[in-house]
Regions:
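DG-centered beta-turn motif at the end of beta-strands
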Residues: 1, 68-79, 124
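Short acidic, S/G/P-rich loop/turn micro-motifs used as interaction or catalytic elements
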Residues: 19, 77-80, 106-107
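Von Willebrand factor type A / integrin I
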Residues: 89-150
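Charged helix-capping and loop-helix junction motifs
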Residues: 83-89
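Acidic, Ser/Thr-rich peripheral helices and adjacent loops at domain boundaries
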Residues: 24-43, 118-126, 130
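Von Willebrand factor
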Residues: 1-29, 33-68, 70, 105, 110-111
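Active-site proximal loops enriched in glycine and acidic residues that flank catalytic Cys/His/Asp
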Residues: 14-17, 72-74, 102-105, 130-131
């Protein structure tokens, strides 16, 4: 969560089937305690990306503009729920960048309950990211891009 040290106005969210803001949790607690608290808040049910996207539309869309980078970390597995890809399209139209980092290999995108092939067209960047080293290098590249354009 040290990304917040590099980027102003960083807000963090978690979800399984509803969006929960966790920005203050990570700012006020040690990482292990913050993760435990977030897991309690979001519960352990199956993920519902469609409902989460509807939550983003209802709660955050007004705050998203051409200065906003939306960064999503997740596998896009929706447990057969409605994809709500039209919300991804709205994010794509409003935000400076929409970036999706997916832990699954690209060859899995669109298989089974994966909605990644529906979401990817509305991402400026969509890529496989399945290790801490990969995440660090991806975020470093994003921060360099952010610093260069700030």
């Amino acid at each position: 969560h040290s990304l917040g040290e590099q980027v102003s106005d960083l807000r963090s969210f978690a979800f399984t089937n509803h969006l929960v803001e966790v920005s203050d949790t990570f700012e006020s607690l040690p990482v292990e305690q913050a993760v435990d608290k977030v897991m309690q808040a979001v519960g352990g049910s199956g993920t519902d990306y469609g409902q989460t996207l509807l939550d983003i539309e209802a709660q955050l869309l007004e705050d998203i503009d051409r200065r906003t980078t939306v960064l999503i970390l997740g596998d896009a597995r929706n447990n057969r729920g409605q994809a709500q890809a039209q919300v991804m399209q709205l994010l794509y139209q409003r935000a400076r960048r929409v970036i999706w980092l997916n832990p699954e290999p690209v060859s899995f995108w669109g298989l089974g309950d994966s909605e990644m092939k529906r979401y990817a067209p509305y991402c400026h960047i969509a890529r496989e990211c399945n290790s801490l080293a990969h995440l660090e290098s991806t975020l470093d590249a994003l921060l360099r891009t952010h610093s260069a354009s700030a």
